[in-house]
A protein has these predicted regions:
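A conserved acidic beta->alpha catalytic loop
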Residues: 40, 48-57, 99
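Short aromatic/hydrophobic "clamp" motif used to bind/position activated sugar donors
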Residues: 95
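Conserved nucleotide-sugar donor-binding catalytic segment
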Residues: 16-17, 141-233
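Conserved donor NDP-sugar-binding/catalytic core segment of glycosyltransferases
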Residues: 107-139
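Short beta-strand/loop segment that forms part of the nucleotide-sugar
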Residues: 41-50, 70-75
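N-proximal low-complexity "stem/linker" segments adjacent to membrane-targeting elements
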Residues: 1-35
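Acidic donor-binding/catalytic loop of UDP-sugar-dependent glycosyltransferases
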Residues: 54, 81, 102-115, 133, ...
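Glycine-rich, basic loop-to-helix element that forms the pyrophosphate-binding segment
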Residues: 74-90
Length: 401
């Protein structure tokens, strides 16, 4: 099919890939959300696995209307193979995949392309997504997204990146590889970790996608096999025999099975399990969505900046606190605060402690407090902003509002 020649002013070409198999009830809405994007240099590949439910009629109708929509239909060995096929066929500098029951928000592709243009070192950008029900009605904003990227937490605790909100520079796939076709549930999580091990991964503030959640999703139907795959990925990347993900997703799998039983006892057990899951996840949080930090917060960064700048608020008057700054396991500074209010600290980063690739900088507080009787979180300070400056300044995580 003929492709519209790109113009220099159109920005880098973005290729969207949709893998699909017998998803006719949702497919048209997915295609419409891509076809109506306001980004001019767009390529769209629909990789169909041999559908027999009318999906091909929907695809043909849209492909006839929009010359940037291309498609093929043939049997494959699952979602990962279909997406990889799309990666190989794509001509875009930026690639993403959108499953055939998810949709993009208006302007999503343009905002992602603009963000990546402003952050040339970033190889994977992610944002927010809203969870919708079977009918497309919003349920909630995806609650696990972390605005400050943390490699350790991604590799060992949970996948906090909403897949349809992600956009990838295609060239990084030549370095780290495409999706592992042996994985059926965690292929995206595994790819995020492999990219983040070598290059900056950044959050950008935007509501980019709608993530559909209903009883027949592959995630819901995965059961124990999905849990075992999660455990294998977490073990591989964290080096831990029993990483936190082992327990968090094990409890989640049990709660999902209980969901099939509508008895009062099962509902009570399910509610109890989800409370435990939330406690487990919160225990490993660095920073809450409102900017409050737990006992420690870790920043992942790359290259070799000269200094780190941290801005925050210490809330307690006449209560002294010590804050250690630890670079790649070495404590390099300790700060003491005694008065409540805003603070700004600047830390010079010793060049001899910086790694060539991924680095970790930890800020650890000596005191915790509870904000009120109604807020039982154990907190240290509120993060306002952070930055790495000087040297080969790296891309780093986004600000906290």
């Amino acid at each position: 099919m003929r492709m519209t020649p790109p113009k220099d002013e159109d920005g880098p070409r973005v290729t969207i890939i949709t893998p699909s198999l017998n998803q006719a009830p949702y497919l048209e809405e997915t295609i419409r959300s891509v076809a109506t994007q306001d980004y001019p240099n767009l390529e769209y590949w629909i990789i169909d696995g041999g559908s027999t439910d009318g999906s091909l009629d929907i695809i043909r109708r849209w492909a006839d209307r929009f010359p940037f929509i291309r498609w093929l239909s043939e049997r494959d060995n699952g979602q990962s193979e279909a997406i990889n096929k799309g990666f190989r066929l794509s001509s875009g500098e930026i690639v993403a995949w959108l499953n055939s029951d998810d949709t993009y928000a208006a302007g999503a592709v343009r905002r992602a392309a603009e963000f990546l243009a402003a952050h040339p070192d970033c190889m994977l950008a992610y944002s927010d997504a809203v969870i919708v029900d079977d009918w497309g009605a919003p349920i909630e904003i995806y609650p696990h997204t972390q605005k400050i990227f943390n490699y350790r937490r991604l590799a060992s605790v949970s996948d906090y990146i909403a897949q349809p909100s992600t956009f990838i520079r295609k060239k990084v796939l030549d370095e780290v590889g495409m999706l592992d076709e042996g994985l059926h549930w965690c292929m995206d999580w595994d790819l995020w970790i492999r990219i983040a091990d070598k290059h900056p991964v950044l959050y950008f503030p935007s509501l980019t996608a709608r993530l559909r959640d209903y009883a027949q999703t592959k995630t819901r139907m995965g059961g124990r096999r999905r849990w075992m795959e999660i455990v294998s990925v977490a073990r591989k990347h964290s080096g831990q025999r029993f990483p936190p993900a082992y327990f968090i997703y094990g409890l989640e799998s049990t709660a999902t099975r209980l969901n099939l039983d509508r008895s009062v006892r099962s509902r009570i057990k399910r509610m109890f399990l989800f409370k435990i899951i939330k406690l487990c996840i919160d225990r490993h949080l660095d920073v809450f969505p409102d900017g409050w930090v737990t006992q420690k917060i870790e920043f992942s960064f790359y290259n070799a900046p000269a200094r780190f700048i941290l801005k925050g608020v210490w809330p307690l008057e006449n209560v002294p606190v010590l804050m250690d700054v630890v670079l790649n396991g070495h404590r390099i500074r300790t700060f003491r605060f005694e008065a409540a209010g805003m603070f700004t600290v600047t830390v010079e980063l010793p060049a001899e402690l910086l790694a060539a690739g991924r680095n970790a900088l930890l800020v650890r507080s000596s005191r915790l407090f509870r904000y009120s009787r109604h807020d039982r979180r154990r907190l240290s300070f509120r993060l306002i902003d952070h930055a790495f400056e000087g040297g080969a300044a790296p891309a780093t995580g986004g600000n906290i509002p």
